[in-house]
Amino acid sequence: MRALRPLLVALIVLVAPPLASAETVTLDAARRAALAELPALQGTKLNAEALDGRVVVVAFFASWCPPCHPEFDNLNAAQRTFQRDGVEILAVNIFERIGRFKDDPGRLDRFLKRKAPAFHVLGDGEAVAELFGSVDRIPTVFVFGPDGRPTLHFIHARGARKTHVSFEELAVGIRAALGAPPSVGG
């Protein structure tokens, strides 16, 4: 055991700085204000003050992203389920015009028409994505409680089998943010 101690200390020194520097993203006043500045693609203009003290879901997506399609269905289901609880769902469009995807300007409109989101959809979110921990993978979803602390953070990892957050996972995160038991029933 004594021989392993230097190795263990070295391992802690190598691993501890990244763990200590990892910042938990919260939905603070600056992030709420930045979200409110984004153009509304679907729904009404967002009011930052209306997000104060509420459970807020923030989902980053692009219309060309295959996992974002079923995730939008789950966001719609969450909207129907939790609307009476005052939950706000915001979908933030990022990476829409990159690479070969910039050649189809009508793709986003077709996506929104097909998915018919019953929640706020905001455009031009690249700068806001930086405020949420440099979102560089989609879909990425956060659920924030009324205090602004996250109860769920999902990132679609490259090559992962799990490609998007399920309705059940959203429901557990939202219920935790609401202070309710984590059951997944409607």
Question: Model-predicted segments: where are they?
Answer:
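Bacterial N-terminal signal peptides
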Residues: P6-P17
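Short, internal strand/loop/helix patches
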Residues: G106-F144
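Alpha/beta-hydrolase fold active-site loops
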Residues: V55-V56, P139
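Conserved redox-active cysteine motifs that mediate thiol-disulfide chemistry
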Residues: F60-A77, R100
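Thiol-based oxidoreductase modules, predominantly thioredoxin-like and allied folds used
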Residues: G86-K102, P117-E126
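Thiol-/selenol-based redox modules, centered on thioredoxin-like
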Residues: V143-G186
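N-terminal "domain-start" segment that seeds a small globular fold
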Residues: S21-A48
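Conserved helix-turn-beta segment immediately C-terminal to the redox Cys motif
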Residues: R54-V55, P70-N93, K113
